[in-house]
Each structure stands twice: as C-alpha cells, then as structure tokens.
Amino acid sequence: MKALSELRILTRDQAAALSGFHSTTRVNVRLSKLRRARLIQRYFVAGATGSRCSVYALTRKGAQTAQLPFQPLKWSADSVIIGNAFAAHQLALNDVRIAMSEPGPTLALWKTLDEPISPTAKLVPDVLIERKIDDEWRSMFLEVDLGTETLPTWTKKTQYYLRIATSGEYKTIIRADRFGVLVATDSEARLRLLRTHIARLTPKLFWFTTLNNIKQQGFWSPIWLRPEGDQQTLPGA
C-alpha cells in the first residue's frame, strides 16, 4: 500500500518485488483481496509482448485506510490505458526503484519531483536520489528517457542543470556539496544520441545507461557512461 501511494501504479511483478513476495499465487491472492475490499483498483496497459498487462493503483478508500497520501488518477477502474505516456514512464521509473533495492549502498532518499527545483530554471527531474557513503552525502537527479523528448528540450535541460551547478543554487536543494544527473534511456541508440548531443554542451555532470542495463545488472553497478569516453563507472562516481 505504501509503495502504491509513492509510485502511483504498479504491475503485479513490481508489487511482488517491492513487497518481497516470491510466489505468484501469493501476490495474486493479496491483490485480489485488496481489490474486493476496494482498497486498490485495476487498469490495463500493453505488456512486453503486446498483450494486456494489469496495473494497480490505490483508491481513496485505500489511502484513507492506510493513512497514506492519495493522488487520484483520471482513469475509470478496469479501463484500458494502452499507449498512455504517463503510465509507460511511471512503470519505467518503478523498475529503476526496484533495481535500487538490490544489494548495494543504502538508499537514503527517493523523492519524486512534481515542481521545478529552482525558481530560475523550469526544470523538473523525475526523481532526486540521495545516499550516504562513508559519512558523505551523494545527490543525483534521475531522468528516465523513453525517447519522447526532443533534442532541443534536452539542450534546455542541460543548460538549466549547468546553471544551478555553476551558480551554487543547488545547495538550497540537496544535502551534498555537488550533484550528478543520471539519464536512463530505453535503448542503446537513444543513449548514443543523447550522449553525443549533451557532450557538445558539457563533458561533466551527466551519467548515462539504459533501463535494460539497470534491470539486468543493478542500479548501483558500474554500468554508467559519461558524455565522453568508454569507461563505465558507478552512478555519480
């Protein structure tokens, strides 16, 4: 229930991973009970093979029962939301969040951002991630890219990130003394395109990988590339 409040929608497999269930039967029974009690409701999105895949969201009753924040969705229960950009993006973010739960550095903060992080920059990263390693805070903004944003949009984003980095304005936003920008793309081709484009603006600040790499090898693995060079590093290292 807490994960649904934080992440808005979850597939069955995502719900199982976040709750620690290892049995499909067990998670199906749990979801069915919650639906019958009207604590959650179901929608349908396109699965990996093109078939329909069920996703679940918290209802107002569920949020009130669990005393959790409620963010209403505009869809009717059991409706088909195939092709919805918000759903696709949120489910991709969920996969990243799950990959961060694998063995590795303790995640101190995962904060979804809905408003600009600065009054001087129209910049809304997907998530602020902060973790503590050897008594030192590391702060990273996460951008999940499914290929829907234009290169001019990425130019503006990069310029905004550079502005808050050079001005020192980030010190009012994060706990660390510096930050990085992590970009997770939906394909190797998109990764190459964004790296090449952003490298024209800066060789610093950014790290890139694919969503597939994150799912297969883990978020905290050395799977990240800088705008220039071929050496893979840890995120934000």
Where are these regions (language model features)?
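Non-catalytic C-terminal interaction segments of nucleic acid-processing enzymes
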Residues: 1-3, 12, 148-156, 166-237
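Nuclease-adjacent, charged terminal/linker segments that flank catalytic cores
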Residues: 1-80
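Conserved aromatic-histidine-acidic binding/catalytic patches
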Residues: 3, 7, 19-22, 84, ...
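Short, solvent-exposed loop/turn segments at secondary-structure junctions
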Residues: 7-11, 63, 115, 147, ...
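Structural motif
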Residues: 8, 38, 104, 168-169
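Active-site metal-binding core of divalent-cation-utilizing nuclease and nuclease-like domains
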Residues: 43-45, 84-88, 97-140, 146-160
